[in-house]
């Protein structure tokens, strides 16, 4: 079944709602590639007028303890404690993120840096197009993201970090966003907003974009894979309020995980499958929360006052990257990328720009 071409005014409204809300079995048409000159390769990264930020800045914050919240899971499994990593465990790998280098909500770009904040690169250089929701492939060789393509549609793209080639993986009408590659690198999961229904759908596809199809009976957004690749963690308002759920790839075993106020969506599963991290709270008062994978033993991870959001575990599971405003609270362009250990210590700022850096996703 081929989707109908949407009414453009309606699609513009959907895109606006989507961006400001989430600042976030049909066969798929045959995939196609973009022309290489539409986007940058790694050899043409950050323009000379954009200086690399100062990196790895420790943030002075008062000592704090985890805030415990009543668990939501009815499971009788024992609560586990988050281990305290040694001070010698330093962050490694790379972090991809959305960088608002032009201070404009109409031209967001995708950037990449090492996990200590060094080697900053801007990956996209189509200055007048919007790019969102990057993620790094499990093998560390490519970055996926959502970008404007044509007719007010957003599609999923994959940028090869080795040779700089760029592929368009989806070809649909509507909004395809928040893409992630499965742990075995065989499949994609992403959010699809269909203009005909205005529903947020979870979509599975082959890594190259083929065999496109919805997870049956599931409406939601911001999907992320379980470490074993057998389930998806996502956000949904199916019961009236936004909460996190897990579901099998065939739509079975739908399980509500959280019962937190004002959850937005972006979350992550620890590499060992033991923990989930998410964020919750009203605007300008959001915090990160870490919990057991069944939703029990919920604790506040970040110190209060930073409006923290959009968490992502490091590949070794010892750190979490996120967006916050600790140093520029209340400023429109004040969001930066921070990391923190999973025991809530060693908070560090990685970026220090006069524009917003957000939606971090950690990879090898």
Please report, for each region that a protein language model flagged, where it lies by residue.
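Sec-dependent N-terminal signal peptides
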Residues: 14-19
């Amino acid at each position: 079944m081929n989707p109908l071409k949407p009414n453009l005014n309606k699609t513009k409204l959907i895109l606006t709602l989507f961006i400001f809300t989430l600042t976030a079995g049909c066969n798929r048409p045959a995939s196609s590639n973009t022309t290489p000159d539409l986007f940058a390769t790694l050899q043409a990264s950050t323009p000379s007028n954009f200086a690399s930020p100062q990196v790895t800045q420790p943030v002075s914050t008062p000592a704090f303890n985890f805030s415990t919240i009543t668990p939501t899971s009815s499971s009788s499994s024992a609560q586990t404690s988050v281990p305290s990593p040694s001070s010698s465990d330093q962050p490694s790998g790379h972090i991809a993120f959305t960088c608002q280098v032009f201070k404009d909500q109409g031209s967001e770009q995708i950037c990449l840096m090492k996990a200590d904040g060094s080697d900053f690169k801007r990956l996209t250089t189509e200055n007048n197009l919007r790019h969102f929701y990057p993620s790094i492939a499990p093998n560390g060789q490519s970055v996926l993201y959502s970008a404007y393509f044509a007719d007010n549609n957003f599609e999923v793209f994959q940028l090869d970090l080795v040779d700089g080639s760029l592929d368009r993986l989806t070809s649909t009408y509507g909004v395809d966003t928040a893409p992630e590659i499965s742990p075995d690198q065989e499949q994609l999961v992403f959010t699809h907003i269909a203009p005909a229904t205005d529903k947020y759908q979870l979509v599975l596809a082959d890594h190259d974009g083929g065999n496109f199809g919805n997870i049956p009976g599931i409406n939601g957004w911001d999907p992320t894979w379980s470490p074993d690749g057998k389930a998806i963690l996502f956000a949904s308002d199916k019961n009236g309020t936004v909460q996190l759920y897990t579901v099998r790839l065939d739509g079975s075993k739908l399980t509500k995980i959280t019962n937190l106020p004002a959850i937005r969506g972006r979350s992550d599963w620890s590499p060992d499958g033991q923990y989930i991290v998410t964020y919750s709270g009203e605007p300008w008062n959001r915090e990160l929360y870490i919990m057991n994978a069944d939703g029990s033993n919920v604790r506040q991870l970040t110190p209060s006052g930073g409006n923290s959001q959009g968490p992502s575990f490091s590949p070794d599971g010892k750190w979490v990257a996120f967006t916050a405003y600790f140093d520029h609270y209340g400023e429109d362009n004040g969001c930066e990328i921070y990391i923190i250990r999973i025991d809530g210590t060693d908070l560090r700022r990685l970026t220090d720009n006069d524009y917003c850096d957000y939606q971090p996703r950690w990879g090898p």
